[in-house]
């Protein structure tokens, strides 16, 4: 099933953990609608500008979230009008891509995760979410400190 010109449902629901553990990671029709909006509003414009988008984590069922230690309230669950994914574009600076996404798409939340700076432009990945009800335009940086994940606002 196509979610946008260049994105398929299979691409957004694939999960090695779900496959290994036999977890059903198939979304409901309402969740598919939310994933479609994420693809149309956020991922497709990124693809049109930057080329191939490598989605490392898209939809996660509640059971999959529990299995990987994530929250069942995560936007990756594609509930409550929202959907999220983690991605990168190989060979492109993640900060440069994230800055473009923030300024050029109707993003709800954007997190530049574990990026180590211009000297390591391919470090980390980008988390992006879309919410049909409320676009917070929140841009954060995720980093580790004292063994814990912390977040701070990204200045643009």
Give the positions of each predicted feature:
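A residue-level signal for beta-strand positions that form part of recognition/binding surfaces
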Residues: 6, 52, 84, 125
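Charged/polar, solvent-exposed surface patches and flexible loops
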Residues: 37, 48, 66, 96-103
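Extended, low-complexity, intrinsically disordered C-terminal regulatory tails
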Residues: 40-70
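Short His-Asn-centered micro-motif
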Residues: 56-58, 88-91
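Short, surface-exposed glycine/acidic/tryptophan-bearing loops
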Residues: 62-85
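Catalytic cores and adjacent binding grooves of peptidoglycan-active enzymes
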Residues: 79-83, 89-156
């Amino acid at each position: 099933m196509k979610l946008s010109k260049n994105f398929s449902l299979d691409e957004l629901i694939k999960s090695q953990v779900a496959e290994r553990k036999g977890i059903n990671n198939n979304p409901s029709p309402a969740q598919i609608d939310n994933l479609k909006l994420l693809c149309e509003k956020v991922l497709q414009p990124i693809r049109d500008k930057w080329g191939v988008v490598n989605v490392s984590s898209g939809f996660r069922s509640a059971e999959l979230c529990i299995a990987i230690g994530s929250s069942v309230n995560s936007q990756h669950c594609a509930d409550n009008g929202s959907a999220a994914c983690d991605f990168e574009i190989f060979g492109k600076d993640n900060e440069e891509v994230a800055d473009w996404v923030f300024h050029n798409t109707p993003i709800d939340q954007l997190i530049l995760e574990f990026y180590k700076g211009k000297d390591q432009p391919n470090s980390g990945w980008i988390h992006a979410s879309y919410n049909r009800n409320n676009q917070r335009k929140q841009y954060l940086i995720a980093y580790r400190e004292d063994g814990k994940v912390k977040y701070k606002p990204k200045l643009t």
